[in-house]
Structures are given as structure tokens and as C-alpha cells.
Amino acid sequence: MGSGCSKTRRPASVETKTITFPGIPQEIIDEILGHLAADSAVVSLRSCSLVSKSWVQPCQRHLFHTVIFASNYVDRWLKMFPELEESPARRVRDLRILIGGHNRVPEKIFECIPWFTNTQSLSLLGYWGSPLLQIPSVWGLPQSITSLTVNTNVVTLVQIRDIMAQLPNLNNLSLSGFLLPVDARLLVGIGVTLKGRFGGQLKLCGGYVREDATNMLLEIPTGLHFTEVQIRCTHKCLPSTVRLVEACGETLVKLSQTITFQGKCHPFSQSPWP
């Protein structure tokens, strides 16, 4: 600036004090201040580059927060992002996979699941209409997952156990639909290897309100600490279902008022615990 300029053209705060704004990179702030000080009508290429670069990550977090994988989408995803370094998978927080029906995913989907390192919620969805998808027993699920939802008719309880066994931080569990039959010998001690927090919300609906499924949860060595339980079924109340609710007694805050068996509200739907 020339010496004849007024003091208003030379703000001392700009020259002597670092100005910061939360969420905005300092180099962008410095570039803006430099542009104002130069009193130029032309925006530099560096300014445009810095600003556009700063919005990449927030846009990715918004666009890829929830990803639903069906048959055609998997191929497009892998074609667009063949390498981990280029993939926005780490931005995904809610991952939903269609494992049943005519739009079910191809089995190669399981190869890229380990890329979703920050996923918090996993949903497995789909009903009858296609052969059973060959789900591998171990497919590198991110340990960041705290919520698991299974709403399908195309899995066995053993497969669900194998999935849960990969999630040491599992807190919320929702199981609905129906289970495929499996050799009863495979269900002995099915829950003893499971580890998780199990301190959030539990939902059991339909064909999952059955002895083998509830026994699996009761066998978990770390115990059950769910603070909210919702059970929806129309058949007879099972002894293991009562034990399941009682196992959460010390931590239970809310017991769903929609728990019904044969159309009647079961006595323990009025929670005896504070």
C-alpha cells in the first residue's frame, strides 16, 4: 500500500493478529485476507483451488453418509472406485446391503466391505425370490459398527452369529423376518463366543422370537445390558423370552408397551424395574 493511503486501508488487526474461524483452514483465511489487502478484483487460481478443495470432504460426508447396495449399484461403485485410496467408503456411516430378492448384491461385495472403516450402522435386508447368497463366515466387518439390523428371510441363525462375532462394539440389535432352518447341532452353545456391549436397544420381531434366537443372546458371556427392549410376536410367550427380558432387568429403562403374544399384552410389558 502507498504511504498516502488512509489508516482504514491498513487495518492493524490484519497485519498483527492471526484471524481464525472454526472449520475453515487457516490457509484459506490467509488467502482471503491477502486478497482483501491487495484490493484486487481478480480472484487468484490458488484461492479457487483452496476453497474448492476445502469442500470436498464435507460434501463426501453428506453424499455418502448412507449407502444402499443392490445388484446394479455394486458394479457401478466398484467401477467408479476400484482403489481404496479413491473410495469414499470411509465417509459412509450407514451401510445397507440387499442380500435377498432379485436385486440382491453379488458376492464380490464382501471383498470391499473392509474399506468402510467408519461405518456405524449395518443393515442386511431382503426377502424370498432368489437363491441364498453365500455369505462368508468372516468378511472383515469394520469394528466401528455399533448397530446391526437384520430384516430378511434368507439367512440362518449361524450366519447371524458369525456376523455378530465380528462386532465387538455392537450396542443396538434389531432382528426381524424369518430364519432359514439349520442343523440343531450347530446351535449348541451358539452364543458363547459373542462379545459386544449390548447396552442400547434390542428389537425382536416375527420369526426371531424363538427359543434358539433368544438362547443365543442369553449365552453371551458379557451379559445383556440393553436399556430398551421391543418384542413383537403373535405366538405363545416362550420361557426364554421372559428370561431375556429379565436378564436386562438391572439396566432396563424402557420396555416396549407393544409386546404382545396371541393378541394379549404379556404381564412383563408393564416393567417391574425403574
Language-model features and meaning:
Residues G2-S3, R46, Q57, G263:
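Secreted/extracellular small peptides and ectodomain modules produced from precursors
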Residues K17-K108, C112-W115, Y127, P131:
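Hydrophobic regular-secondary-structure patch
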Residues K254:
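Conserved functional hotspot residues or short segments at active or partner-binding sites
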